[in-house]
């Protein structure tokens, strides 16, 4: 019985540390995923023709900088990963938002297929798109059983 109580206390004492580690890893994965998502978005043919070479280079340079930082700082704290993501979003979001608005919103106006996988930055992991509600001015489509 004493062993069980001791193990429960040990588990409780490690819980906070485990939670911090989980949050740190989630922030790292979020940053890495966003960086690769931006890179993939810019490689799509439908997007390539709509982004200026200057804007494309600006995003890709920042993505490469972030990926190099990730390689060198794999054990960084959650706040550092979140800061890097915000910096990356501050470069990407204005360009992608402008592109999205030029396309006429959610897949309309010459943007075949829209943004595959959804609009970058709206994966629910924070940040979101700079520029307000994005393409929410159009009709709402609800799934019916």
Swiss-Prot record:
Pfam hit, one: HSP70
GO biological process: endoplasmic reticulum unfolded protein response
Keywords: Allergen, ATP-binding, Nucleotide-binding
GO cellular component: endoplasmic reticulum chaperone complex
Gene Ontology terms for molecular function: ATP binding; ATP-dependent protein folding chaperone
Region feature (Disordered): 1-21, 103-145
Amino acid composition bias (Gly residues), ranges on this chain: 104-137
Family: Belongs to the heat shock protein 70 family.
PANTHER family: CHAPERONE PROTEIN DNAK, HSC70CB, ISOFORM G-RELATED
Name of protein: Allergen MAG29
């Amino acid at each position: 019985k004493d062993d069980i109580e001791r193990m429960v206390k040990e588990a409780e004492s490690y819980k906070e540390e485990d939670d911090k580690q989980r949050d740190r890893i989630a922030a790292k994965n979020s940053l890495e995923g966003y960086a690769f998502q931006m890179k993939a978005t810019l490689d799509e043919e439908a997007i390539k023709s709509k982004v200026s070479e200057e804007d494309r280079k600006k995003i890709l340079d920042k993505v490469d900088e972030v990926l190099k930082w990730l390689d060198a700082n794999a054990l960084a704290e959650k706040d550092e990963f979140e800061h890097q993501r915000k910096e990356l979003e501050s470069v990407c979001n204005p360009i992608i938002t402008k592109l999205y608005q030029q396309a006429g919103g959610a897949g309309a106006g010459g943007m075949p297929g829209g943004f595959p996988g959804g609009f970058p930055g709206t994966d629910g992991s924070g940040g979101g798109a700079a520029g307000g509600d994005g393409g929410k001015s159009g009709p709402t489509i609800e799934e019916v059983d």
